[in-house]
Amino acid sequence: ELKSEARIKGQDLSDYYGMWVHQIKTPIAAMHILLQSVEDENPALPELKEMKMELFKMEQYVEMVLTYLRMEDMSGDLQFEKVSLDKILKQSVRKYSQMFVLQKIRLDYRPVERIVLTDEKWLEFVIEQILSNALKYTKNGGEIRICLEEKRGRECLVIEDNGIGIQAEDLPRVFEKGFTGYNGRADKKSTGIGLYLCKKIMDKMGHKIWINSEVGKGTRVYLELTRQEWNPE
């Protein structure tokens, strides 16, 4: 009985957050319209860049909450199909195109020409989160590279940046829920949820993810998309 009550309360809380997320999308859309109006009237306004970046971050946080809530019933939401990896990559890059321009970050990406068996929507979220982190921790004028490499005898998608890197003592914990590490403490804006969600999603899809990094040189995120056993837990 206690478990049943806890489950009901948990569902009520999830429903509340879900409603909140959908409702907050309306003022965010209105802010986009207002910001566009300001830009039309005064395109040289120095604060425009910062306003755009902060609004984009707000959208990402809302999307992260929505994904976190959907994780509860992810198993019933998975739809595996053969899909072009380039299609997913291009959609993800397009979403962040404004950030690449605003931060003057170069993208080194050539079509990988691979078909993968995956859930397009969930894999796209994972790639978006990795790009978001790369942009967040790469200085203006830096570079992000997307390519294929063979690791552990398997072909992997690699998303690499030449940003600030991750401290060696933090690397084993980057996928822990709520862990922000040195970079997160310095940045004071990290939620410690993005990479946690990536790992959970990749595990449930039977894919693999791991990270190599060196402070001052950058970070490489590896996605092994050959499907292992599906894990619905």
Which residues are covered by each model-predicted region?
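Short conserved segment of the HATPase_c
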Residues: I166-F179
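Short helix-loop "hinge" at the ATP-lid/N-box region of the Bergerat-fold HATPase_c
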Residues: A134-L135
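Short conserved segments within the C-terminal catalytic ATPase subdomain
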Residues: M99-Y109
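Short alpha-helical Gxxx[C/S/T] motif in the catalytic ATP-binding
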Residues: G194, C198
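Acidic ATP/Mg2+-coordinating residue in the GHKL
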Residues: D161
